[in-house]
Amino acid sequence: LESDDNLVTLGHNRLAIIDLDPRSNQPFAYNENIHIVFNGEIYNYLDLKKSLGSKGYSFNTTSDTEVMCAAYMEYGEKCVDYFNGMFAFVIYDKKKQLLFGARDRMGKKPFYYYINGRDFEFASQISAIQLFNKNLTISQKSINNYLSWGTIPDPDTIFNEVKKLKAGYSFVYDLNSGSYNQKPYWDLDYKGTNLYKG
């Protein structure tokens, strides 16, 4: 998908799990203003579909992808509060001229991104970002972390210029201003929990 103003280009290679019909292929257009690319599965999409249907939303597919778009239309950025599953997604809201995305609560699905001026790139694999950016530099901090702990903690990656969206975070990228803002929509709640009993 390429927007009329050439500001947004979305691509997707789909592994069909729920709705195998080509009508559910991605990038998926919910209407003329809402488009989505989505990696994962929403486990409670049938319950959401029923709830949204009672609010007047209609559906042309049996996919969880379409339900996510309707949830965004109804709840805006709060839609992630209703999703139970593993996911990384980006919604292009043409009317508001923004990209809205999120990563699931436990970070099961990966989400890498690169920002350079007004250039915002994202992918589920870091190699996809590498294809278009040949001057990425290796992060010594990330090498040290990997050699010490066997992992590179979010939001860092092996490259200085590429970051991971943290688990349980959502973001908004404003296409007009080029501003990128992320925030947690979920975190573990330890309040009132006795973690140590001695």
What residue ranges belong to the model's regions?
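Cysteine-centered catalytic environments shared across enzyme families
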Residues: L1-G198
